[in-house]
Design a protein with these regions (language model features):
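Glycine-/charge-enriched secondary-structure boundary and capping motifs
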Residues: 43-56, 60-168
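A glycine- and small-aliphatic-rich helix-loop capping segment at beta-alpha/alpha-beta transitions
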Residues: 1-4, 37-42, 95-99
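Short, compositionally biased
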Residues: 32-43, 153
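Short, well-ordered alpha-helical segments in soluble proteins
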Residues: 20-26, 39-46, 70
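N-terminal low-complexity, intrinsically disordered patches enriched in charged
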Residues: 25, 35, 92-94
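Residues on a specific face of well-ordered alpha-helices
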Residues: 17, 29, 33-37, 64, ...
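Glycine-rich anion-binding loops of enzyme active sites
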Residues: 1-32, 165
Length: 168
């Protein structure tokens, strides 16, 4: 069990906190209804292999790197970016009266999402509201902890990066 004082529920997030993204491994398990409408030939080649292989890349498990960060840093909020993408999942981990600000220019959108969007002529807001767009998990931390958290995640092979901040 987790001590009550160590539960990460977003209630301590404050203005200026930093949003750190851990990259996803692909589509994960969300948005396949939309994928099925767009992709009709699963043998079609994509990056030198059938697109089905890319679409079925296993979902990354974030437990070990996130637990390592939790042991060393005061993580104020966490969000696993699943169905609903960043717009639906991030606000749930931010305290009332605050909101997450994601700087789209800082995102590292995976090519598979660009491909799906182009093939299906899907509006950007629908893409961001359906898929993780390359962000699998987000940690909300104090600005002073940002570099240390990113370095800790790197020890686990994660190329984490800042994607935004919390504002009132």
């Amino acid at each position: 069990a987790v001590e009550k004082s160590k539960i990460v529920n977003g209630s301590t997030t404050s203005e200026g906190d930093i949003l750190i993204a851990i990259p996803s491994s692909g589509v994960h398990s969300n948005g396949f209804s939309l994928v099925r409408k767009v992709i009709t030939d699963y043998n079609k080649e994509y990056n030198g292999k059938p697109i089905s292989e890319t679409l079925l890349t296993p979902t990354k498990i974030y437990v070990k790197p996130v637990l390592a960060v939790l042991e060393k840093y005061n993580v104020k909020g966490m969000a696993h970016i699943t169905g609903g993408g960043l717009p639906e999942n991030l606000p749930r981990t931010i305290s009332e009266g605050h909101q997450p600000v994601v700087l789209k220019e800082k995102l590292r959108v995976l090519d598979i999402f660009k491909y799906i969007q182009k093939e299906g002529d899907i509006p950007e807001d629908e893409m961001y509201g359906t898929f993780n767009m390359g962000v699998g998990f987000v940690l909300v931390v104090d600005p002073k902890d940002k570099d240390g958290v990113i370095e800790e995640l790197a020890k686990y092979g994660e190329e984490a990066f800042e994607i935004g901040y919390v504002q009132k």
